[in-house]
Amino acid sequence: MAKAKFERTKPHVNIGTIGHIDHGKTTLTAAITKVLHDAYPDLNEATPFDNIDKAPEERQRGITISIAHVEYQTEARHYAHVDCPGHADYIKNMITGAAQMDGAILVVAATDGPMPQTKEHVLLARQVGVPYIVVALNKADMVDDEEIMELVELEVRELLSEYEFPGDDLPVVRVSALKALEGDAQWTQSVLDLMKAVDESIPEPERDVDKPFLMPIEDVFTITGRGTVVTGRIERGVLKVNETVDIIGIKTEKTTTTVTGIEMFRKLLDEGQAGENVGLLLRGIKREDVERGQVIIKPGSVTPHTEFEAQAYILSKDEGGRHTPFFNNYRPQFYFRTTDVTGVVHLPEGTEMVMPGDNTEMRVELIQPVAMEEGLKFAIREGGRTVGAGQVTKIVK
């Protein structure tokens, strides 16, 4: 094997393992790190199974999630990989986006085929916008009958097609994570084949700086003799001095203005970009024209909406959530980016109520418009206390 040297210039991609309990997600994660460590020792450390299985707990918006993070490199790319030990952790992670995925490895045991959680994870992947899936047909060493293997593969492809993934075309790689961990040459190669499929069929994500400019407003100030300054962290894109922007959300009408100055740490800049905390000086805007919770955008790139469908996870009592269920027409606050907006919840037909610890679909009507797109995340709050988290799956109006 030629040695690949560590280059920070390598594309970085976030992936994760999803699939039914005991189909081998964590074993496969460990096997990938071992196989890549053996193939490219300078690039990778092997992470043992126990370190991944005893994942530390993280808190995201008050929700406790056990997530294991490992990293590894192929010759082409640098990967950050998430694996969750429990089924509930997966659901919370996927809905809250605690660890965003550019693509996923769906692990299906060849001995079982698709199971209920396989379906649930694929449905969630579709709903929360995991864009690409590669299938690892695990425990392939335990199935001798080629016909059975082909049937299982067909079943997985049909399931993926049913949820609008390209089931007929996406890669399905037969692996044995356990045998690869034990150092078996044939199955070690299968894991390398899997990573080649991941390299080739999960595209590099668009970088935040390449997306249209958006900055949520956190604060508004007046600077005597200069005008109104809004501050916030640029969520995406690049903004240059003297560019025109729209300010939308919260109020019914949008405001269009020109950015006459960009400051960071009291220094004037020519441009600000994704990830930076900046102050923007706005031409001809009075302090009362803008408020926290609005967003500043590249004109026309995002629109404000009041009604949307969402997938949400409701905190359990142990997580500090509600102690009782809620019903149709529940009216909490929805915290988008930097502010709370009250909304009315409509539950799906046939859902009487939602218990703490459940995940559910819902349709929400907000009392004020919010700049939103599919995939936007929010917290559900009652008087400042987080009781749930979710993301927009479809805009209604």
From Swiss-Prot:
Catalyzed reactions: GTP + H2O = GDP + phosphate + H(+)
Ranges of residues in domain tr-type G: 10-206
Region G3, residue ranges: 83-86
Residues that, per the record, bind GTP: 19-26, 83-87, 138-141
A cellular-component GO term for this protein: cytosol
EC number: 3.6.5.3
Segments of this protein annotated with the region G2: 62-66
Region listing for G4, in residue ranges: 138-141
Region G1: start-end pairs: 19-26
Subcellular location: Cytoplasm
Entries under SUPFAM superfamilies matching the protein: EF-Tu/eEF-1alpha/eIF2-gamma C-terminal domain, P-loop containing nucleoside triphosphate hydrolases, Translation proteins
Major subcellular site: cytoplasm
GO molecular function terms noted in the UniProt entry: GTP binding; GTPase activity; translation elongation factor activity
Keywords attached to this entry: Cytoplasm, Elongation factor, GTP-binding, Hydrolase, Magnesium, Metal-binding, Nucleotide-binding, Protein biosynthesis
Residues binding Mg(2+): 26
Described function: GTP hydrolase that promotes the GTP-dependent binding of aminoacyl-tRNA to the A-site of ribosomes during protein biosynthesis.
Family membership: Belongs to the TRAFAC class translation factor GTPase superfamily. Classic translation factor GTPase family. EF-Tu/EF-1A subfamily.
Subunit comment: Monomer.
Descriptive protein name: Elongation factor Tu-1
